Amino acid sequence: MNHIQGSLIYEGKAKRVFACENPNRVLIEFKNDATAFNAKKRSEIDGKGRLNCKISAALFKLLELNGIPTHFLELQSETFMIADKINVIPLEVVIRNIATGSLCRETPINQGTILNPPLLDYYYKDDELGDPILTERRLKLLDLISTSQIEKIETITKTVNKILKEYFDDLDLLLVDFKLEFGFNSLGEIVIADEISPDNCRFWDKTNSDPKGRILDKDRFRQDLGGVIDAYGEILKRIERDSSNSS
């Protein structure tokens, strides 16, 4: 069902959120903008919005089939999705299966170390503050959500990790780490929001042993490796191939 695009509610680094005729729903547009390091590095990559929108839709559907609540409702077009309107919790929840990125910059842990159990970190979502990491006590001090809601988010995140790790393993992809955002829908339920794409997940190609060649996510933009669209397109191609094989 097509929804009429209303006024702009919010514009972030990678998406625009618009009102629609149903007050409990929104239209989310995925932009071609690429940013890194809290938008200190910027570019525009043609086709990126389309790929992220389609990848996110497919992964949200996968999670919904496995009983995980998300804000996703349906695709409106290749770059727009219809979603539940939510009150966003200003937290970024990161779960790491393999050590890389900031974890290796900030600790002596070696790149590529398998993290068992996976490491779960919270960050306060605020660009001006640089999205600082939160200890358990700081998280409670901020009083953003209750202790039981924190526990629910942790449970959902760990379950999502298990589902996606197994799913991508079958696609010859390692799910290195990923970030989730959450919010409350109109019923007061906690649901996954934002997106799930190579913008907020790290994927390594299991069939490629080259440390740079195997990267199929936004690290290609962060590290000036090039081939961003090819990498994102490869993720979508494997997802769609799996979908066609399953149908």
From Swiss-Prot:
GO terms for biological process: 'de novo' IMP biosynthetic process; cobalamin biosynthetic process. This is Phosphoribosylaminoimidazole-succinocarboxamide synthase. It is an enzyme of class 6 (ligase). It holds the Pfam family SAICAR_synt. The keyword ATP-binding applies. Disulfide bonds: none annotated. Its EC number is 6.3.2.6. CDD domains: SAICAR_synt_PurC. InterPro entries: SAICAR_synt/ADE2_N, SAICAR_synt_PurC, SAICAR_synth, SAICAR_synthetase, SAICAR_synthetase_CS. The gene is purC. Keywords: ATP-binding, Ligase, Nucleotide-binding, Purine biosynthesis. Pathway: Purine metabolism; IMP biosynthesis via de novo pathway; 5-amino-1-(5-phospho-D-ribosyl)imidazole-4-carboxamide from 5-amino-1-(5-phospho-D-ribosyl)imidazole-4-carboxylate: step 1/2. Belongs to the SAICAR synthetase family. One of its GO terms (molecular function) is phosphoribosylaminoimidazolesuccinocarboxamide synthase activity. It comes from Prochlorococcus marinus (strain NATL1A). It catalyses: 5-amino-1-(5-phospho-D-ribosyl)imidazole-4-carboxylate + L-aspartate + ATP = (2S)-2-[5-amino-1-(5-phospho-beta-D-ribosyl)imidazole-4-carboxamido]succinate + ADP + phosphate + 2 H(+).
